[in-house]
Amino acid sequence: MKRLQGLGASMLLVLAMVPFGSVQADTTLNVVTAGDQNMVDYVNNYLAPRFEKMNPGVKVRAVGTGPGDAGSQKIYEKLSAQSKAGAAAWDVDVAVIHQRGAATMVKENLLLPYRNDVSVGKLVSRDTAKNALGANVDGYVLPMFHSQIAFAYNPDVVKTPPKSFTELNEWVRKNPKQFGYNGVKGGMSGVGFVTGWVTAYSGMADKLEKGPYDPAMKPVIEKSLAGLKEFNQYVVMTPGNAGTLDMLNRGEIAMGPVWVDMFYTWMADGKLPPNMRVKLVAPGMPGQPMYYAVPVKANTKLAEEFIALATSPEVQAEGIVKRFNWYPGIDAKNLEGKLDEAAWKKLFADISPDDLQTKGKPFPIAPYFNDILEAYERKVAN
């Protein structure tokens, strides 16, 4: 009896030494993200501490699957395997994925339609929240951010920048070798320029963005690119996304398509003259979002709360805009008053929220996208 009493006393002593609340294991919210390492760092270093403070006992753990569509494909394969295995709970609560991955996962019933269950869902109206390269993802995703392609230009040289692709076509003839882009192999800023050109000159804007795909439209795409071959005689071909910015910095060209977030990052690092500007021309140029999604067998309540925080105007302003120079995932007008005046002017002085709403376009759906690249190689590059 004395031995049992001694054991009981020892157990009480051990329990007394354990901090209250740690007897029960923490709940882990698993965030799996495609993209570069900065995506993982953003979740672990910025979002996680805020969410954990709001939810004592919850631990956010982010892991990355790598950049590009390949990163999203790995998340798809992971969810698909767990679905086929009949797992009661999956080990991904929040997925951060590209458009192509989202389209596949919605089609295969791997994601929950959660957007209308979170208050921030009503703060998003851009078509990219509903349409992922022609696939209907309405309700299943919320954009984390939007990256956008636009024209960067030197206002000392380009006094009156073109407002449309038609005006640009006229401008390069009057200002030969002052415009540069990287074709379709050196980076997506050049690809975005080419798809923007086809949108402007083919009359196929809705079809390119939403489908359905019609292979009979290939001659229309090829015809729209005929003018681009002549256009290229008056321009400089740059070596890539960074190459276009570098040539702008050195004054070798005065205008060219760039990723806006790269543009502002280069400017902040002193790699571009501070007077450089950006412009989004009619009828528009493409950009692309990253999406927050909730898998079918996730910890749904916590996942929705996490995404609601991540897409709130306050976090979008501080985390997405100020830290990364990305455009917000929610409509930009909802950030007014959340950003200091300097940050607002920096990001929206040249391209307004209305410009993003009307001229920020998605890339064409996959089969048209491939047709454009193939036609460019045949009709323009050769």
Predicted regions and their residues:
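A ligand-binding cleft/hinge motif common to bilobed small-molecule-binding domains
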Residues: 102-104, 257-273
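Mature extracytoplasmic/periplasmic domains
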Residues: 285-286, 290-360
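Paired acidic/hydrophobic, glycine-rich loop segments that form the ligand-binding mouth/hinge
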Residues: 88-96, 237, 254-259
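Extracytoplasmic ligand-binding site segments that recognize negatively charged/polar headgroups
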Residues: 34-44, 68-72, 92, 98-236, ...
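Early extracytoplasmic/lumenal segment of secretory-pathway proteins
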Residues: 26-99
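Sec/Tat signal peptide C-region and signal peptidase I cleavage site
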Residues: 20-25
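Conserved C-terminal helix/tail region of periplasmic/extracytoplasmic solute-binding proteins
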Residues: 349-382
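Periplasmic-binding protein-like
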Residues: 147, 222-231, 260, 272-293
